[in-house]
Amino acid sequence: MSLYGALAYNYEKVAAGTAEILSGNRMISDRLGLPSEDMRLALLSFENYLLANRNTEKPVLHISLSPAPEDRLTDGRLAELAERYMQKMGYGNQPYITYKHADTHNTHIHIVSVCVDEQGKKISDAYELSLIHISEPTRHAQISY
């Protein structure tokens, strides 16, 4: 999926009232400190990272995390879940934006980021590719939340 596609999907949900911007990291922010509801500004937040390395085949990260419905996490806890997950996966210093979706029976979050750092280096996806390791941050998140 392209960065534009990942952001457009989430911003369409925001415009429809079935999602909201929950948090962000290293994003162009509004006066309240949240990522802007202007998709153009979100695209600009990622631009330098993508321009630093045009050779990476899949530079976009679009993650969905779905806590159990009975957990009923607050917005603050969902934002914390996203932050801890991104840290554990090695993307904690990347720009990312977290959306809360309420368009299904289970409230869940989507995280959009890029896999290239500021210097143009591809962030290792070895942690992502190992099912054992992928389940570790998720399992830790389940225990924590």
Language model features: what each stretch is:
Residues 1-135, 139:
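N-terminal nicking endonuclease/strand-transfer module with a His-rich metal-binding environment
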Residues 143-145:
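Hydrophobic alpha-helical segments, chiefly the membrane-spanning helices
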